């Protein structure tokens, strides 16, 4: 079985990075599955936690950080341009690898993941409580127009999650809501 994890970057000393790597290592070393971790913004930084030599790490090299140094209009242009590039690159890798299962940590790819026709089962895996996904709570605090954008993205995220084949959440409260 081929399993692909999708994550932004494995470069922070955080629970999500550690959890993803531990699960991937277990699946590769103990369960003898073919495991790939695809990141979008690793930027040649080494992973903080050790990755099994049986795992293939692919960074598709999109620097989403470069959008943050501009005004809202330019930032929007960068975001959609980078998302288009991300979709093309991720689609290429999923069609090349032909995974049986793709596990998303509900990052940017959630916007289009279920639209990719690669034949895989799509699973969402949340490593933070629902109100804090994609830092939308911070945008909501900034006032108009950020609050409207955050509401739109939250609604879009909830619709996308419903299209996944399965969803693993952090808390019982998230499961109930």
Where are these regions (language model features)?
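Residues at the starts of beta-strands that form the adenosine-phosphate
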Residues: 2, 33-36, 121, 165-166
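N-terminal strand-loop element at the rim of the active site
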Residues: 5-13, 26, 31-76, 174
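A conserved mid-protein helix/loop that constitutes part of the nucleotide-sugar donor-binding site
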Residues: 17-22
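Membrane-proximal helix-turn-helix segments that form the acceptor-binding/catalytic region
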Residues: 88-95, 130, 146-167
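Short N-terminal targeting/anchoring amphipathic segment
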Residues: 90-109, 121-123
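Active-site proximal beta-strand in glycosyltransferases
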Residues: 101-103, 116-136, 147, 168
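Helix-loop-beta element that forms the nucleotide-linked donor phosphate-binding surface
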Residues: 116-117, 162-163, 175-177
């Amino acid at each position: 079985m081929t399993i692909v994890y999708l994550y932004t970057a494995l470069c922070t000393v955080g629970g999500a990075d550690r959890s993803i790597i531990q699960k991937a290592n277990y699946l590769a070393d103990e369960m003898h599955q073919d495991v790939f971790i695809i990141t979008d913004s690793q930027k040649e930084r080494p992973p903080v936690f050790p990755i099994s030599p049986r795992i293939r790490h692919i960074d598709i090299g999109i620097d989403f950080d470069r959008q943050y140094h501009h005004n809202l209009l330019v930032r929007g242009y960068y975001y959609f341009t980078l998302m288009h590039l991300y979709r093309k690159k991720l689609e290429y890798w999923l069609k090349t690898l032909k995974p049986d299962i793709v596990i998303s940590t509900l990052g940017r790819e959630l916007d289009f993941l279920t639209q990719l026709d690669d034949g895989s089962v799509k699973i969402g895996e949340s490593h933070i409580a629902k109100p804090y996904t994609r830092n939308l709570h911070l945008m909501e605090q900034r006032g108009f127009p950020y609050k409207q954008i955050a509401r739109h993205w939250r609604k879009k995220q909830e619709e996308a999650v419903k299209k996944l084949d399965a969803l693993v959440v952090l808390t019982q409260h998230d499961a109930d809501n």
